[in-house]
Design a protein with these regions (language model features):
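Hydrophobic/aromatic residues within well-ordered alpha-helical segments
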Residues: 12-15, 85, 168
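A short, conserved acidic/glycine-rich loop-to-beta-strand motif
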Residues: 85-95, 100
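Short beta-strand-to-turn element immediately C-terminal to the catalytic PLP-Schiff-base lysine
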Residues: 103-105
Length: 174
């Protein structure tokens, strides 16, 4: 809540009951905390967000923060920048060494993805050439506008969020 968030939904899978017990033992830390249960089937980030759509019914942007990410980034500032830039999704990225990179044009709009280890690339854009774009590593932190849920209708219950963002990047600012 120190970063301005007072409603949280947690996707649970591994040690799900321990997470629920911990939150309940701490009186939900004085904020609204709900759970989206994936103990029977992991849905990947995209499917997890889609399953939790019911929680985001107030038409306000929301933040997704992967559990295995430690960061000292100012989350309040990330949310503020998202509101200022008018994007459907704002992805927190950095210049760091990894095998997989998101590829951005000069306006910082998402245009593709590359796996440097395997050479695999993905892009919805014709004539895509990875060397023409800036490589940034995705942090697993993102701010989304609820309008993206209607675009998820054509995606299955389980899907990778990067594939979704790439499909959106044709018509939306990502």
């Amino acid at each position: 809540s120190a970063a301005g968030f007072n409603e949280i939904i947690i996707n649970i899978h591994h040690f799900g009951q321990q997470i629920i017990d911990f939150v309940e033992a701490n009186n939900s830390f004085g904020i609204r905390i709900e759970f989206s249960d994936e103990r029977e089937q992991l849905l990947d980030t995209g499917g997890g967000i889609k399953k939790a759509a019911w929680f985001f019914d107030d038409n306000r942007p929301f933040m997704v923060h992967n559990v295995d990410i430690l960061s000292n980034i100012d989350l309040e500032e990330v949310a503020k920048q998202h509101s200022l830039n008018g994007s459907a999704a704002t992805l927190v990225c950095s210049e760091r060494e990894t095998n997989r990179y998101l590829l951005f044009n000069e306006q910082n709009h998402l245009r593709g993805w590359i796996n440097k280890k395997t050479g695999e690339t993905k892009s919805p854009f014709t004539g895509f050439k990875p060397a023409n774009y800036t490589e940034l590593a995705f942090s697993g932190i993102q701010v989304l506008h609820p309008s993206i849920f209607r675009e998820m209708d054509s995606f299955p219950g389980r899907f990778y969020i990067i594939d979704f963002y790439l499909s959106l990047s044709v018509t939306y600012k990502i």
